[in-house]
């Protein structure tokens, strides 16, 4: 398989590891790709961590040497999307350090209350009512509503925890408006990953454990898929 594709887009949690649990087969798969000099990019809906943090986790905790350049998160894809719009300067953010760093890297001014050109929402484990209030008011006054992803649950060693989709659903209910969703299974993150690697859809395969996110992302983007379990 490593000779058939020029590039591999690979999910992380549930595919290469689960929480702190190592998947030996995942490590062997990455080693084979590295040995064959195949290009691969970890494409994750997790918006809470920076690429450096993701790479460090893979390297230090899962014995998979990784650089930040081999990581593409939904937060990075969201920042790329807003930058391409060209009319967004002030962003009201609900999220964690991964989303913050991605937005700041693109030069956006982050605000905690309106006015704002866009509201960017991802998983925020410090969410509170006031954050939802400010985001609601900003969207009601015309801010674009953009979500990193709408995963309902976040799998880890504790079980299936509430995901970013839980927060997005609350805000969507408040504003009675659907967001632009960036992460898998939407095509925006896949298009960003293709641009990042310089490859075309027919040159890559999407590898993941979740049909509703990873596999549908490939299908929606006309990219071959490989479901692992």
State what each model feature region is.
Residues 1, 107-117:
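Short acidic low-complexity segments
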Residues 2-23, 40-43, 218-219:
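Asp-based phosphoryl-transfer active-site loop
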Residues 8-10, 30-58, 71, 90-94, ...:
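Substrate-recognition element of Asp-dependent hydrolases with the DxDx(T/V) motif
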Residues 18-41, 49-53, 69-77, 84-86, ...:
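Short, acidic loop-to-helix structural element flanking the phosphoryl-transfer center
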Residues 114-130:
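Short, well-ordered secondary-structure micro-motifs within conserved domains or adaptor modules
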Residues 148-185:
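Glycine/Thr-rich beta-alpha phosphate-binding loop at enzyme active sites
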Residues 181-214:
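Conserved Lys-Pro-Asp/Glu-containing loop-to-beta segment of HAD-superfamily phosphomonoesterases
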Residues 207-229:
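Acidic, Mg2+-coordinating phosphoryl-transfer loop and its flanking beta/alpha structural elements
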């Amino acid at each position: 398989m490593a000779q058939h594709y020029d590039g591999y887009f690979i999910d992380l949690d549930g595919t290469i590891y689960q929480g702190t649990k190592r998947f030996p087969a995942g490590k062997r798969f990455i080693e084979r790709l590295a040995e064959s000099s195949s290009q691969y990019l970890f494409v994750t809906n997790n918006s809470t961590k920076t690429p450096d943090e993701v790479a460090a986790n893979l390297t230090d905790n899962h014995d998979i040497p990784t650089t930040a350049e081999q990581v593409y998160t939904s937060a990075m894809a969201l920042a790329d999307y807003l930058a391409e719009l060209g009319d967004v300067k002030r962003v009201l953010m609900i999220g964690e350090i991964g989303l913050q760093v991605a937005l700041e890297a693109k030069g956006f001014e982050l605000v905690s209350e309106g006015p704002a050109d866009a509201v960017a929402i991802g998983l925020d484990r410090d969410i509170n009512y006031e954050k939802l209030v400010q985001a609601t008011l900003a969207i009601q006054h015309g801010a674009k509503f953009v979500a990193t992803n709408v995963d309902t649950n976040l799998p880890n060693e504790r079980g299936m925890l509430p995901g970013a989709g839980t927060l997005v659903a609350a805000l969507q209910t408040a504003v009675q408006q659907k967001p632009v969703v960036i992460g898998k299974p939407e095509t925006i993150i896949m298009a960003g990953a293709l641009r990042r690697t310089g490859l075309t859809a027919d040159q890559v395969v999407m590898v993941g454990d979740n049909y509703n996110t990873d596999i549908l992302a490939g299908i929606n983007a006309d990219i071959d898929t490989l479901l692992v379990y």
